[in-house]
UniProtKB/Swiss-Prot annotation:
Mg(2+) binds at residues 152, 181. GO terms for biological process: 1-deoxy-D-xylulose 5-phosphate biosynthetic process; isopentenyl diphosphate biosynthetic process, methylerythritol 4-phosphate pathway; terpenoid biosynthetic process; thiamine biosynthetic process. It is an enzyme of class 2 (transferase). Pathway: Metabolic intermediate biosynthesis; 1-deoxy-D-xylulose 5-phosphate biosynthesis; 1-deoxy-D-xylulose 5-phosphate from D-glyceraldehyde 3-phosphate and pyruvate: step 1/1. Its cofactor is Mg(2+); thiamine diphosphate. The gene is dxs. The keyword Metal-binding applies. Homodimer. It comes from Salmonella arizonae (strain ATCC BAA-731 / CDC346-86 / RSK2980). Binds 1 Mg(2+) ion per subunit. Binds 1 thiamine pyrophosphate per subunit. The lineage of its organism: Bacteria, Pseudomonadati, Pseudomonadota, Gammaproteobacteria, Enterobacterales. NCBIfam families: dxs, PRK05444.2-2. It comes from the Bacteria. Catalyzes the acyloin condensation reaction between C atoms 2 and 3 of pyruvate and glyceraldehyde 3-phosphate to yield 1-deoxy-D-xylulose-5-phosphate (DXP). This is 1-deoxy-D-xylulose-5-phosphate synthase. Belongs to the transketolase family. DXPS subfamily.
Amino acid sequence: MSFDIAKYPTLALVDSTQELRLLPKESLPKLCDELRRYLLDSVSRSSGHFASGLGTVELTVALHYVYNTPFDQLIWDVGHQAYPHKILTGRRDKIGTIRQKGGLHPFPWRGESEYDVLSVGHSSTSISAGIGIAVAAEKEGKDRRTVCVIGDGAITAGMAFEAMNHAGDIRPDMLVILNDNEMSISENVGALNNHLAQLLSGKLYSSLREGGKKVFSGVPPIKELLKRTEEHIKGMVVPGTLFEELGFNYIGPVDGHDVMGLISTLKNMRDLKGPQFLHIMTKKGRGYEPAEKDPITFHAVPKFDPSSGCLPKSSGSLPGYSKIFGDWLCETAAKDSKLMAITPAMREGSGMVEFSRKFPDRYFDVAIAEQHAVTFAAGLAIGGYKPVVAIYSTFLQRAYDQVIHDIAIQKLPVMFAIDRAGIVGADGQTHQGAFDLSYLRCIPDMVIMTPSDENECRQMLFTGYHYNDGPTAVRYPRGNAQGVALTPLEKLPIGKGIVKRHGEKLAILNFGTLMPEAAKVAEALNATLVDMRFVKPLDETLILEMAARHEALATLEENAIMGGAGSGVNEVLMAHRKPVPVLNIGLPDFFIPQGTQEEARAELGLDAAGIEAKIKAWLA
């Protein structure tokens, strides 16, 4: 879409932060209003992350107005909230391409702009990186400032607290801003507290505070009395004792939608020494009433009509794999009181809404804490329960040591329901589920299953849940199922595949939901088609049988080729000295950028035409 200067006259004056800082201060509220309307207009036409950005408009304007970006370095945690940042930093006219193939990256991305200091997508990394950047800036000696913006969800992760603990120890000059959009302490947001924030962030208070510490540092009783007095005074109106104990100078909470007040506070804080913590209160979805009322639904949106106030229903009548999992979970929980379900802040995405309502005492959302989620599951298993950890493939990476140390070594019966396996699409490199087969396959005693359709997914969930000799994993993709009939649940024989079609010369060994494409290729090439089902343990007998009866084999998976299921097939053949040629087809050795799932598969040769072309070229 073309930028409408008449509709956004103030925003039209700002195509860079240098131009922003030339605006008179009194025009900034109007700029914020136009920026919010432009964000609504753009994202509703193109799709993308929505509610978070609406809540950070004033903060973004204030930060770029006060700080000399890009010289001063601004780091956004996760990046869902950074659309206004992209608009103000030279990407205004391209915002309609965000999350699309060849368009703007969905998150801050170093290769896209000098304003994007840290490439992000996963949560809770900003403070750790910010400390390193602040230390480097201090050694550089050019008075470069460092600011990290982190949300109230991301700050719950252990990594954020590890970083703050370190910052309190080495005391770099940096500012951490907590964007709190839960409004959990909204009663503190008002004229008194805004005045207090400006007072506490001022140089007079700061100098008195630090000077008093130095004067009385040698008199422990007086030092302790002063500390307690200060905490008592601040504690009456400030909920920041935790951050103070970690070594930060805490300011807030303040109104995150008062751009003028934010500018005053940020100007005061810019020159303070040591780690600073500013707590701002915002409303997710601010300025668009439907998003304010339902920020979860409007977190990420498809194209929609803003005037309707609602999002279009998903196309197609087929359920998604997440719903298949959620239905199985509820069905099983109704029969087995030992089932416990765990998610690290992915209730909606993992299909667990209905379960959380029907079985609230057996549903555990541990927040953005993947490591804790996995070891918590270990504890439940030790206690005699049957934990199911529902987690995205890309986020399970964050708990790899816990999978090995706390579950696999102890052979605990924990089942991982791995959603978003394979190509995810619009969220790009940070969210593709490209590696789970590779990093799980090498773990002893792990059983790994790859369903080819929704019925097989249900059977595998049932099989994994009733397996008691160690951990299991069932991985399934983002998107709709295939429409096959659902049969009664029964346990599958562990480590056994099935032949779906008999052919000649070539056998295709398929792992997962690329089966429809594999079936088309097998038909076109008159090849044998095998649904391998299990990545671990592999059906070695079936693999050797296929090698003996065919001139060549091709493996197919939506996982990295390196270390994936195909690599396992190669290992079996080499161990048995079978010199049959094998073509491994899967995800290549690079990080896959954003685009639709269909676009990515076509470009990577993982649609039927691409798979057939790869095999023909290899056989030629």
